[in-house]
Amino acid sequence: MEKESVYNLALKCAERQLTSMEFSNLYKEFFNEKFPSLIQEEEEDTTTTANINEVKKASDLVDTPSNNTAATADTTHLHEALDIVCSDFVKILNLEKPLILADYIVEVLLVNYNSDMIKCFLPKLNSVRNSLLLAHFFSKSCSFFAKLSDTLIIDQVRKDLGNVIVPNILSLDMNSMNKELIAIVSKLLQTTLKLSPSPILLTSAGCKNGSFTLLNQLSQTNKLLFKRVSQTFEAKLHFKDTKPFLNKDSTNEFVGSPSLTSPQYIPSPLSSTKPPGSVNSAAKYKDMKLLRYYKNIWLNNKIINWEISNPDFLSKYSAITSSIFQESFNSVQNLDQLLTDLIETSFTCFAQFVSNKQYHQANSNLTLLERKWVIFITKHLPLLILENSSRSPRVVTNALDNIDEKVVKAIRIYFTEKDDNKTNNEDLFDDYPSTSLDIRHDFIKGLIMLNLQPASVINNYLREDQMIDTSILPTRDDLFVRNLQGIQEVVHNTNSFIISSLDTLELESITESITHDSSNGLFQVLHNFESVAPTKQREIVKAFLSIFEDAIKELNYNRIAKICALLFFNFSHSLTTILSFSSPAALMKTLIKFVDLSRNGRNGSNGNDESSEYETINISLSFSWAILLIINLTQTYGISVVDVALKYPELSIKNSFIINFISNLPNVSDKYYLEESNVNDSDMLTKSHNTVQSWLCDLFVNGSITDQLIQNIETRQLANLIPFIVKQVLLSVEIGVLTDISSLIGGFEYFLQPLLLVGLIKTFYWLEQFLSCVKNDTISEDILQGIFNLLNTLFNPVTLNEDSKAFHTAVLRLNAIPLLKVLRKFRVQSQSNYGIYSSDAQGDPNLEPLIAKLVAVLNVSPVYDVDPRIINSENDYSRKQLGYGKFLILNENPINKIMTNQINSFWSLHSSTYYNLDYLFELIELVTPKSFLFDVLKTLEYKLATYGVPGSENKRGSLDSEHVFDYFFYFLVLYDVKTAEEASQLIEYMENDAKKSKGDVDIKGEDLHEKNDSAEVRQETQPKAEATQDDDFDMLFGENDTSTQAYEEEEENEDNDGNNRTNNVPMIKAEETPSKTNKISILKRHSFAVLLHERKLLNDLALENGEITKTENEKFISYHDKYLCMLKTCVF
């Protein structure tokens, strides 16, 4: 028996494949025989348990040497025995043997819970080198703790957590563990810590270092698990003499959200370069509401940049305060408090958004950013609450109850006016009862569907005279569709549902059904996408995009065309919602790869083969639909093809068809080349000339196109050939060379065939500039009618192929707004009406169908950033001129006044920008980033030097001025940067002080000679008086009024439509793929970071040459360093 060991026993049991319970029984018998004295002592201890208190008291009173010696001997004997057994366990774990060996150890240690043995065994785990068995041991242990229900064992585990289990696990060598082991250890710690009812205090520095190492390793491999584990650590682990993981937003625990009327004390951000005594000065900024501003800008940027679905969104939001403020906080904000704060902040920011829209940007239509906000609040917030809260209903109700009344009023009035079609000239203080609902109720409905709130709660947030029948509200997140019999069915398998729906979907029907009563399930879901529960929306998005990627890999052209078409039309804002749940750049990358890398596949195909012809049509349509979707993503959502190509190395810029195509959308060359990259090849030029001649002959002479002609040209070549032909024909008609329009109509009708539809894309963009020129030229009425007649062949065909119907509607939508603008100019005024209102207008009989068609296609599905009067019924007596631009920035105010309003907002440290961010971004593009930056800097310098900071007791203090620049540079950084990766690259770029020659710097040398008065200083003769804080709607949120409406009248003949650009398609020049060193500077070529850094390098050169003074250089370096400091501290 002396030679036997637990090690040998375990091996024999494993060979016989005994269960862990059977091993446990044999182990107990072995231990009884191996260490009989310990068993006897244990039994004796058990029989005397009732007298343990008396014995303990006696031992305390009489501490004899004999007693001490006996106790020490027993303890030593026990430790020796346990050490022998635990050493055998370690030997077992180091074997390359069956996994059941680890089960045996878990059974002995945990199932038959032995605190002394665990304390002896865990420190030895560092000597285990077999990661497979070790991982299995930890996994089984995790499973045991997760299922543990025995209260006696739970009590003992809780006692051992702080001094045995957690310290020993955190003391393991985390650096030597692989990814799988790191994840398993993290899950084990997360599971065991959940058993602790209160935080555990750890005093060992090794534990602290181990936790940081573990989280660091985990963050690189599993971000979702990292978020959960870090949240558990924040709540359950405290280290001696260290700050908690998550800091609360303020020293006052009740300041969890922006207060609108009476903001509590919020510490001011302090730069690391400020003097130590500046902390006392921070108390003077009680009314600056800086924290509200930082959260407002951060949330808006996350929503604008499609970052709201990131798994680390909540943890990043929680880190805003600690990243900006250097104050130390002692209290920990748990997840419920954090979510309450996020809910309040979101509604406050949304109220500020709609208020800016109503009172500062009354001539703009900000529907895209507004829709993004609505999706975030009604879909993403409920998901965050579902996955991170304790499920307590009070998390939401507390937040909704704490929202300031002015926020509620602003939201309510906005939605009431939106529903009732009121004008902004009515009484702003009118607060009459209305039955309209607002975004708060849509938010609550989403929570009800996820069982996070009872249905009855919605009535608590209605007016006293309102009531909703809660029985009709859905209380489950099931996805319903209506079958052919009209019966609703529940969708159980989303993936198979989408695939089957796509296979049965008829593409031509998606734009024909006005009532949207199609029996196709996917069509129904997308047309009612706003009413789908957030969980199902996310599930649909994931499955939909996965199916799309598979279709592209498998070259399932029919499915590709259908998916692109459904996404393009954005039914019920489905595409916008899909982009909010996914990565728009990833979708764009997939589309670019498909368009650029896929081959045409039509060359040499047999035109007589019916299946081959069907496949040829599918190939051509899938290619054409993909181009339409790319243009839509670029034009509507601002996703740049060049930026995406720069981001992904597998995409080419130089030889990209789609980048070149989009860059030249409105331009049709006077010469046609089959291969534009090889224009000097004489053979290619001859072939191109012959191709054009053959097509013109077949279209307008022979009256039919031969199969050989179609088979010998690729779809991408047709995309440029057909616009070229249309241009030559229309120009010939305009100058009177072609007069027989009837002979041309037949040829134009061919352009509507499925294989040739791709040519209409460029055609409709070019038509805008062509019609503008025609309007400005003096041509006869007959020629004008002939042009309109030809255009009606393309706009309103008498017959249209079934495969062409949906695409025809889609391609008309792309450039419909600019075309409507120019076509309406051809209308003739029938009466003057003294110029009071826009009077009745009449157009050519061939003109009105063109306008009506464009209005009709725009009403098929949502359009963004468009004056709703453009696409609604004709309003002959509209008080305001129709605005066709995205933002009519100069229609009501001159640029000086607009800039002054915004600069005053920066200067006064308001809790939001004066104008909404999307409007501001357009403004920056209009005036150029360079002018915006230096105008704001020079004006702020002047205002701070002359007036100081409004609302500050120490108005002229240098620290006060620092806060204003911190405020402004925070805006600049978040304007430039979308992700932490971009921030890291920009930091590396800006910290590179290598000298450049003047030729290498983008900024012109003469800019150095600008004096302080070269940029117009936006100033008033005197600072404006403070606005009273109880004014409900002059700056709704208790800030000073920065409006400059009292300025002297500007000249009325200024350019009032500076933003009515012909189209929104950027002109991009394809370049060589950039090297790694300058990639970020090209990707961020329009950023303030590149502007500041290039100017800094140029200033350094100028200082060496004596062109500027050292003081001027140091002043600019301080701005460069402030941007860099903010770049390092901001949360992305």
From Swiss-Prot:
GO terms for molecular function: transcription coregulator activity. Residues 998-1023 have a biased composition (Basic and acidic residues). It holds the Pfam family Med5. GO terms for biological process: positive regulation of transcription elongation by RNA polymerase II; positive regulation of transcription initiation by RNA polymerase II; regulation of transcription by RNA polymerase II; RNA polymerase II preinitiation complex assembly; transcription by RNA polymerase II. Keywords: Activator, Nucleus, Transcription, Transcription regulation. Residues 998-1070 are annotated as: Disordered. The keyword NADP does not apply. Residues 1047-1057 have a biased composition (Acidic residues). It is found in: Nucleus. The keyword Transcription regulation applies. GO terms for cellular component: core mediator complex; mediator complex; mitochondrion; nucleus. Component of the Mediator complex, which is composed of at least 21 subunits that form three structurally distinct submodules. The Mediator head module contains MED6, MED8, MED11, SRB4/MED17, SRB5/MED18, ROX3/MED19, SRB2/MED20 and SRB6/MED22, the middle module contains MED1, MED4, NUT1/MED5, MED7, CSE2/MED9, NUT2/MED10, SRB7/MED21 and SOH1/MED31, and the tail module contains MED2, PGD1/MED3, RGR1/MED14, GAL11/MED15 and SIN4/MED16. The head and the middle modules interact directly with RNA polymerase II, whereas the elongated tail module interacts with gene-specific regulatory proteins. Belongs to the Mediator complex subunit 5 family. Present with 2491 molecules/cell in log phase SD medium. Component of the Mediator complex, a coactivator involved in the regulated transcription of nearly all RNA polymerase II-dependent genes. Mediator functions as a bridge to convey information from gene-specific regulatory proteins to the basal RNA polymerase II transcription machinery. The Mediator complex, having a compact conformation in its free form, is recruited to promoters by direct interactions with regulatory proteins and serves for the assembly of a functional preinitiation complex with RNA polymerase II and the general transcription factors. This is Mediator of RNA polymerase II transcription subunit 5. It comes from Saccharomyces cerevisiae (strain ATCC 204508 / S288c).
